[in-house]
Amino acid sequence: MVFSRSGRSIFPLLPPYGAHDPNGGPGRAVPLHPDGITPYLGLRARLSQVWLNRWTILLLLVLARVLIAATGMQSDMDSAKREAQSACTSVETMGSAMASMPHYLSRGVNELTASGVEAAVNGLISMLLLTITGVEALIIFFIKVMYQTYLCLFTMVVRGSTQAALGVIQDTTEFLNKTVQTVGEDIGKAVETFESGLNKFLSGINKVASAFGGEVPTLNISKNIDELKDIHLPGSINDTIDKINSSIPTFDEVDKFVTDVLKFPFEEVKSLINGSLGNYTFDRSALPVPAKEQLTFCDENNGINTFFRKVAETIVAARKIFLAVLIIAATLVCVPVAWQEIRRWRTMKERSQIVRKDAHDPMDVVYIVSRPHTAGAGIKAASRFSNSRRQILVRWAIAYATSPAALFVLCLALAGLFACLCQYLLLKAIERTVPELTSEVGEFAEKVVTSLQNTSAKWANDTNGVIDGMSNDINKNVLGWVNTSTTAVNDTLNAFVDKTTGVLNDTFGGTILYSPLQDVFNCLIGLKVASVQKGLTWVHDHAHVDFPHVPNDILSKGADSSINNSTSASDSFLANPGDKTSDKITEVVMRVLNKIKEGVRTETIISACVLGIWFINFLFGLIRAMILFWGRDKNRGEGGGAPINNNPDVNGFTEVPLTAIPNTQAASLPAPRYEVALKTPPVVGHFHEDEKMGYAGQRALKVDGTSDLRGSSYIEYGIEKR
């Protein structure tokens, strides 16, 4: 292949090193000693610039970026601290207002409590009056039903018995009266006949007796007969029965007595209730009003200052760590770079022999010598292929991807990503301290809730004391009379039973009716009265009221629920609508951290884009190499280059001379001037010597001199520029 086109030259055309040395042997360039004065940098000069290697500079740039980021982060944290202090003051003010809410709410709650108690008492009074009236009427009705039923019952029995007795006596009297009168009349008639005969007999005797101066009395029993005719049973028999009949009690006295006795306690209770609670008004001044609260947790608690002090210490520590680590790394990287420079120097010395042998592609030799690592990597990768064309393409692709410009872009991208990684580590170190701030803020909320709970509990206890006093007053002044009235009713019922029993005893005592009437009374009235007394005893035992107490957390339950039981962070009473964090203080810190995070993210994206540019460049070279990799060279008839006319050696290699051939007359001539090369015919030489890096392949170098053109730095294979 031909490696140049007609009319082009390499500018400037430098003579081989040593061609100006008059002491050099004829036909060869004599190099200077490396430790002497040379136009290029020797080993010591190269080692003196080890600290200027790219890795040290990149690490220092990364260090500078990290320090700038740490400084900016510290400035942002200072701003966040000021905002957090302001937010804490706002929270403190709001917390004080929240803690003082019992002071403002208690007035309304007290009014509500008083109104509720008044309504309850008024309802209780109405209920009691209605209940007392109903119980009074019910008891009186019940007692009247009982004794009137009993009155009707034994009136029926007694009157029926007396009526039957009176009927029997009346029939007996009529019979006796009629019989006695008839007997009297019959006896009267017989006596009259006998008396008439006797009187006639006696009249004769009287005539005789008159002669003797005497008179026989006549018999006259008509008067007695008349008395016999008029005989009848005495009316006292009917009078006794009428007395029994008329003596049946009507219980009017019992009715009046029981009614008066029963009504008295009920009416007294009504009067007392109306007198004591008729116009009941709850004493609102007795209910407590809590004092205002002033919270000072921002001044008393150093949680925020502690958090930001820890953040500042973390940033300073990270700055020191990065400073120490990166400086040490930048210093230590000089060691392998120095070792690399030594190896590079030795490699350059070894590979400089290729130049002296005048047997290889000069551009390839220059590339191998100037870029030993990338060239070595390309040669190593190309060794996997047996085809020389593919070996060349592999080396070209690697050289394309590792050109100075490409490596600059790659190193810039990696340095940017490494700087982003350092900033990310610093950011994560700060984020790990955020839960401490959240915990501190949670304690702020707990302090507010605790203050609310204490104030609410104290107010509730005082209010409950007032309510208990009112309940005791009602139980004593109102329901105490209920207890008294139930006792009085029980006593009245006992008096009713005793009075009724006394009436029955006075009326039927000693008679055969007393025992049955007593049994009937116990059955009809006694058992019912006992049941009523049992019910009144139950009322007496349970006649009291207990107004419900005010809960201790009535004024703090909402705030406590927003802190402990809320599933949404925005439900916290410390949060503003739309806050994504649990409170305003951590929202300030998170906003700063998110800002820093966005900056790191932006830098990462930029570095990734720079890395993508290098990757795209690598893909361009790889795609072109792959296209040529699977292609073939064109023949001359297809537009390819002219055939190479040279004779290979016995090993099949064609020696390719370098650009400049040592001047055999140089020993007797002065050193040449550095000028544009003159147009000279191509010089072809055939040399072959073994060297470490192998052969550059079959080459033919042609240099056409042109005084006004600069030679291209592209490697040319044939007449096609790659």
Swiss-Prot record:
The keyword ATP-binding does not apply. The keyword Transcription regulation does not apply. Glycans are attached at residues 177, 220, 238, 245, 274, 279, 454, 461, 483, 490, 505, 564-565. The chain crosses the membrane at residues 55-75, 123-143, 321-341, 407-427, 610-630. Residues 76-122, 342-406, 631-722 are cytoplasmic. Residues 1-54, 144-320, 428-609 are extracellular. Keywords: Cell membrane, Conjugation, Glycoprotein, Membrane, Transmembrane, Transmembrane helix. Its main location: membrane. It is found in: Cell membrane. Belongs to the PRM1 family. This is Plasma membrane fusion protein prm1. It comes from Aspergillus oryzae (strain ATCC 42149 / RIB 40).
